[in-house]
């Protein structure tokens, strides 16, 4: 069990000499990060989502749902921004969980992100084929080498176009991060220009017709507050993608400044575009007249602009290509981070000295994603994508609480660790670390006052740790009971009440006690700080947990099977190959001082 809770050093990545050709190249600026964030977030789903949500949940108030969902996504973005600037690593949420929550949860988070990036990338590639076919007059008119074919006898529909697109993107990613980000910026610009075209031209047409979509007897809120909130839960998933930015952290020139900027600006741009698009589309035609499959194309067609369908299709294709590029960009870097920690084979951690990207990992992920897109109809697996991302969002919010109230107070040192090489000198310094740690705690010069302070801080850390654990328990109980509509009223409201008391009591406790002073020594300084702690992270945990619980039972069964497979890999490989095996933990301040001297 100790292996599940062992935590690695926050700066283990940065203590490696990072100026050689075998490290990731620092070439990205804030502008590059914004392009990656916007491109990965704005998928083609928004071209369909507006019609479905407006018809079934919100009516003309669709923009309000997008705003609420944007605020909810911003909560997670704030948590990501703090951790990304404090401990920039290609591992993203996996890395944050490893240094705050332990190896076991970190592995599950990293394994769950495979759902988001690899399976999600395959689903995206499959979605490009029908959009591309519209330029050829339909799927049946595609060239033979691109057309979908059914394998006789087994009924499997293969999609060579999707597989080919994935391999093209994989080759592009192998050329280097700057080349990939440049292409991402170009493709994203085309997509954004398409959305601006829809907003401007659609707004002009709506002005000519008098914004008929808002002049309805049912008013602006035909489905009431419940409809607005239900719509927000659906459109929240259109904001997923900004977290891809954090997987490029080791390739950013100034991560403390640019990572928070990239995350925040990307999310703001997406929110503004979504809201303006919603205002125009539901104003152009009555919400009940929107085509649920092609709402924007149909709205323009009803206004006599059938030719606009080609522009919209171009936008959908570029949106999918940008999302695909972002997915295949992030996954190899997360696997690279896991391999550097010993949890995956070292093959995934190798970096090309010429292009300074994890070429082998990128090719492996590309081949896997291409095979999935070629052979499998991943539509049934697409819902699993959201689970992986929401699990990461939740873990990151918990990490912020841990960082502020119970940051790691020990640093792992061993002959196999990443921080020191296996030499006689290194072993001698490790012994000195232990001696210094013991002497610093037993020195008579510290006196009884220091002992009392240590006792107080130790008690405060225990209270904070239990409060964070009870917050998670309260959130889980409250979200579960609130979602259990088939549960009888009495037990349902009882569980809600008890869970709410646990949640509020723990939250009040966290708000009352002081944050740990060691948080100032955690990671890099001068970056973004998440505001309104502990309230903002707890609200983030509550929202994400509610969304996770409300995902269908069939999807959850598939997710649990996937996590079980990952657990087996960890038990039989990762646990025994972890670099933290037989690690010795010493006080953070002692190690920080000695490590600094060693590096100097």
UniProtKB/Swiss-Prot annotation:
GO terms for cellular component: plant-type vacuole; plant-type vacuole membrane. Signal peptide: none annotated. Residues 54-60, 116-152, 206-220, 286-308, 382, 484-492, 550 are vacuolar. GO terms for biological process: amino acid transport. Expressed in roots, stems, flowers, and leaves. GO terms for molecular function: transmembrane transporter activity. The chain crosses the membrane at residues 33-53, 61-81, 93-115, 153-173, 185-205, 221-241, 265-285, 309-329, 361-381, 383-403, 463-483, 493-513, 529-549, 551-571. It is found in: Vacuole membrane. Its main location: membrane. The keyword Membrane applies. Residues 1-32, 82-92, 174-184, 242-264, 330-360, 404-462, 514-528, 572-600 are cytoplasmic. It is a multi-pass membrane protein. Keywords: Amino-acid transport, Membrane, Transmembrane, Transmembrane helix, Transport, Vacuole. Permease involved in the transport of the cationic amino acids. Belongs to the amino acid-polyamine-organocation (APC) superfamily. Cationic amino acid transporter (CAT) (TC 2.A.3.3) family. This is Cationic amino acid transporter 4, vacuolar. It comes from Arabidopsis thaliana. The gene is CAT4.
């Amino acid at each position: 069990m100790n292996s599940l809770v062992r935590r690695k050093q926050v700066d283990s990545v940065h203590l490696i000499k990072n100026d050689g050709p075998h490290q990731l190249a620092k070439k990205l600026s804030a502008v590059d990060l914004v392009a990656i964030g916007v491109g990965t977030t704005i998928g083609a789903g928004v071209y369909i989502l507006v019609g479905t949500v407006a018809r079934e949940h919100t009516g003309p108030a669709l923009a309000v749902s997008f705003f609420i969902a944007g605020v909810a996504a911003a909560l997670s973005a704030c948590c990501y921004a703090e951790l990304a600037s404090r401990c920039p690593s290609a591992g993203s949420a996996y890395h944050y969980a490893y240094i705050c929550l332990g190896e076991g949860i970190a592995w599950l988070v990293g394994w769950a992100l495979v759902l988001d990036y690899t399976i999600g990338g395959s689903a995206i590639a499959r979605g490009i084929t029908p959009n591309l076919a519209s330029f050829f007059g339909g799927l049946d008119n595609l060239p033979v080498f691109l057309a979908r074919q059914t394998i006789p006898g087994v009924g499997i529909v293969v999609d060579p176009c999707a597989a080919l697109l994935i391999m093209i993107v994989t080759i592009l990613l192998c050329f280097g991060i700057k080349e990939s980000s440049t292409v991402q910026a170009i493709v994203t610009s085309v997509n954004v220009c398409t959305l601006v075209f829809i907003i401007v031209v659609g707004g002009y047409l709506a002005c000519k017709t008098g914004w008929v979509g808002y002049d309805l007897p049912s008013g602006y809120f035909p489905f009431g507050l419940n409809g607005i909130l239900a719509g927000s839960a659906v459109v929240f998933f259109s904001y997923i993608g900004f977290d891809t930015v954090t997987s490029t952290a080791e390739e950013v020139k100034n991560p403390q400044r640019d990572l928070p900027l990239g995350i925040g600006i990307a999310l703001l741009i997406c929110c503004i575009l979504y809201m303006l698009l919603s205002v125009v589309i539901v104003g152009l035609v009555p919400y009940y007249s929107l085509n649920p499959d092609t709402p924007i194309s149909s709205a323009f067609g009803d206004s006599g602009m059938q030719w606009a369908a080609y522009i919209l299709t171009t936008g959908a294709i570029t949106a999918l290509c940008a999302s695909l590029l972002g997915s295949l960009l992030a996954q190899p870097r997360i696997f690279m981070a896991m391999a550097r920690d010993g949890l995956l084979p070292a093959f995934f951690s190798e970096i090309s000295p010429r292009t300074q990207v994890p070429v082998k990992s990128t090719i492996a992920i590309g081949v896997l994603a291409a095979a999935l897109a070629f052979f499998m109809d991943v539509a049934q697996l697409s819902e699993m994508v959201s689970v992986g991302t929401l699990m990461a969002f939740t873990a990151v919010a918990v990490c912020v609480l841990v960082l502020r109230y119970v940051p790691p107070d020990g640093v792992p040192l061993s002959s196999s660790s990443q921080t020191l090489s296996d030499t006689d000198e290194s072993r001698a310094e490790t012994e000195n670390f232990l001696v210094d740690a013991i002497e610093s705690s037993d020195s008579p010069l510290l006196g009884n006052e220091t002992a009392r302070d240590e006792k107080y801080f130790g008690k405060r850390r225990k209270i904070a740790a239990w409060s964070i654990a009870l917050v998670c328990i309260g959130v889980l109980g409250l979200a579960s009971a609130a979602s259990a509509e088939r549960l009888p009223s009495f037990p349902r409201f009882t569980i809600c009440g008890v869970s709410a008391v646990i949640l509020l009591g723990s939250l009040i406790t966290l708000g009352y006690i002081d944050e740990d002073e060691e948080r100032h020594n955690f990671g890099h300084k001068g970056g973004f700080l998440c505001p309104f702690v502990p309230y903002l992270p707890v609200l983030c945990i509550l929202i994400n947990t509610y969304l996770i619980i409300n995902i269908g039972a069939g999807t959850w069964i598939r997710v649990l099977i996937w996590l079980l497979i990952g657990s087996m890999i960890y038990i039989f490989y990762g646990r025994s190959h972890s670099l933290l095996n037989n690690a010795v933990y010493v006080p953070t301040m002692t190690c920080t001082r000695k490590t600094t001297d060693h590096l100097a």
